Amino acid sequence: MTDESWPMVEEAVFRLFDELAAKDAGEHVAVGPRLAELGWSDIEAEYPIEACQLLFRAQGRSLAHTDCLDRVMVAELAALLDEPVDGIVLPDLVAGYTPGSDSDRVAGIVLGPLDGRLVVPVSGAMGAVSVGVIEADRLTGQRLDTFDPSAYWTQVSGPLDVALVDASTEWNRAIAAAHRALATELVALADQTLRIAVDHVKVRVQFGAPIGSFQSPRHALADASAVLEGARALLGESWRYGGRLSAQTAKAAAGRAHRAVADAALQVSGAIGLTAEHELHRYVTRGFQVDSLCGSYLQLEALLGERLFDIYAPGRPLPAIVTRAED
């Protein structure tokens, strides 16, 4: 594959996710078989970062519900797993990115219906994490009443009596991968939200002129766009250099940027933007829903602040968000 062929890959993936969103609206889709038809393993091998980014750009753009997040996190834990799994039990929303399960009991969230074999991360002493695998039919699940009504999330609980293996390092990598992936989806959702608002102010006429010609709407959208571009730049650095802290910061920035764009878009769109018939609310509610996974931007900002205060001392520099490898 050449760099010239990458736009064709993007087009194919965008088209696939648009089809999934249209055909399987409201359903949680295992996207692996459809990606295999595109030769995804070869694409991932040649463009590992760009391929992962593309999936979450496409998901945010299309509003499809897929198992992409499970795929990304399980890939970081794969070396510890003896057999293939179908998903992962994510931490409860109030727990941020700390697993809610312990050595005796499963507690957390599954994206989609409760089915198949699931990886269960388990919190231990001093921040340690271990993982086990359990059959979904041994757990109890209840569909959550989500802010985005199209999202299918399941609250799961049940006894845990399977073998556990230490996975502290692998779990940190999985959470960092999740933060980058979710941040990418949030930026894509914010892009679509901003596009809708800009299109609206171009055609909505008040006082004999498009409202986009007035200073207040222009400045509100420009300010939101600036916040979004800052988050996009930080996210790009996190993808480029990796690291847990940079991923956490990128997701916090992306969540805050989506909120800023949503606030501005709802303001300039007026009452029409709140109606079920208008598409704006779909990108707003989906963004709020996605932001809550693995730590909302408010939770992550609080954790980042606590870390800075814990390590601060007079004369000591702040920690680097991005650390470049030495040449």
Regions found by a protein language model. Give the residues of each.
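Generic structural signal for helix capping and beta-alpha/helix-loop junctions
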Residues: M73-E76, T275
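FAD-binding core of flavoproteins
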Residues: L69, E76-R195, G315-D327
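Active-site nucleophile and cofactor-binding loops and adjacent substrate-binding regions
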Residues: A45-P48, T66-M73
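Generic short alpha-helical segment signal, independent of protein family or function
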Residues: F56-A64, A78-E83
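Alpha-helical interface subdomain recognition
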Residues: M1-S62, A176-D327
